[in-house]
Amino acid sequence: GIYPPSEGKMLIRPPGQNPRKLNGLKPNHVTENGLARTFQNIRLFQNMTVLENVMIGRHCRTSSGIIGAILKGKSNKHEEAQIVEDSYEVLEKIGLAGFVNEFAKNLPYGAQRRLEIARAMATDPFLLLLDEPAAGMNPLETKELDDLIVKIRDQEGISILLIEHDMKLVMSLSDSIYVVDYGKKIAQGTPEEIRNNPAVIKAYLGEEVDA
């Protein structure tokens, strides 16, 4: 939705439906098809509360949308109340229920990352794309992120597409891994297959040296 592909097709298959082509769709239409994402660089509304950030994500699943929420007509009061309830529920799952009225800019770095994931989850996706979510995190924050992603996958039934350089995190979370080196796929397989792949070892660890 942000950068059009130079070639090929992007297809997404919502549960129980036929594949849909994403090429050429606007970002909001991509979201409506069940794909949500976070960015490598945090893109929160820093001067809005934690709750308001998540509510913005939820508005894509309403009939009134963002404009209706701003105008606050009588017809959408019930819908707005439902958005608040749904947003609280997401924050509870993510572990941020105690920060609903805090400004996003005041959250610790790891909590800001969680808030981005919460906002993406509020769109009710079946596929969640996480772009280097562990970037800039310390080991404790990375472990907490690992636990959160497992929870989202196993308890919420949301598929995760993870783009990440932290190989320990990738190996612990993934069922299937694609390895890209300078824009070209050099390997595909299970974590164990990738761990023992000569091309991956060469690209990421350097040439093997005899002891």
Report each predicted region and the residues it spans:
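Glycine-rich phosphate-binding loops of nucleotide-dependent enzymes
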Residues: 1-211
